A protein has these predicted regions:
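Conserved glycine-rich Rossmann-like NAD(P)H-binding loop of the short-chain dehydrogenase/reductase
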Residues: 27-35
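NAD(P)-dependent short-chain dehydrogenase/reductase
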Residues: 153-201
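Active-site helix of classical SDR
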Residues: 144
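Conserved Rossmann-fold NAD(P)-dependent oxidoreductase catalytic core, especially the SDR/UDP-sugar
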Residues: 71, 97-140, 154-158, 164
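N-terminal Rossmann NAD(P)H-binding glycine-rich loop of SDR-like oxidoreductase domains
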Residues: 5-24
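Rossmann-fold cofactor-recognition segment
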Residues: 44-54
Length: 201
């Protein structure tokens, strides 16, 4: 059955891959992102170049009444989160609450697929990490992801908004069929840098 899917941050590395996967599944896919990258938008049913918490974006969510919201938008680097935590708490937590506060009043609640991070584990002693390990984020970035995970649990208990959390660890690589979606140039992620070094060595 065809679903209506909104991907926030759908022009980004992870969001663009997810948007394409839903489209290949036969779903209607709409992207909301502050940055327009043409090559990531060629197959989607619609896109809106705007902050995901703007009035325009929230009106779009309301009008589309999606079955699924894949929430990838936010600020994502650990280092800058230490020097400018306000930006991270605003973009990753406060704005997500605005989105959830809209959705909680929907008669038909969409499932929220949240793009979290393995950084919620901090410097845990059990490696590799598994989902049952305690979380102990050490950066503001990781803390914002852990906070949203907790908020999603509370919103499920209070408002029956279903959600699933994905804790990624250093996603890297290109889309395997067309090779038109892939890692950003000058990536800061260690896996991407290691791959680049091995290819150019």
């Amino acid at each position: 059955m065809e679903k209506t899917v909104i991907v926030t941050g759908g022009c980004g590395y992870i969001g663009s891959h997810i948007a394409r996967a839903f489209k290949q599944n036969g779903d209607r896919v709409f992207v909301i992102d502050r940055v327009k990258r043409e090559h990531t938008l060629k197959d989607v049913d619609g896109y809106f170049i705007s902050d995901f918490a703007s009035e325009e974006s929230l009106a779009t969510v309301l009008n589309l009444s999606p079955d699924v919201i894949v929430h990838c938008a936010g600020t994502s680097l650990v280092g800058p989160s230490i020097t400018d935590p306000a930006d991270y708490y605003t973009n990753n937590v406060s704005k997500t609450i605005k989105l959830l506060d809209l959705v909680k009043d929907f008669e038909k609640k969409p499932i929220i697929l949240f793009s979290s991070s393995a950084s919620v584990y901090g410097n845990g002693t059990n490696k590799p990490f598994n989902e049952g390990d305690p979380i102990n984020p050490i950066s503001p970035y990781g803390k914002t992801k852990a906070m949203v995970e907790s908020i999603l649990t509370d919103y499920w208990n209070a408002y029956a908004i279903p959600s699933t959390v994905f804790r990624y660890f250093n996603a890297a690589g290109a889309e395997p069929f067309n090779f038109d979606l892939g890692q950003e140039p000058n990536a800061t992620h260690i896996v991407a840098r290691a791959l680049e070094a091995s290819i150019t060595a």
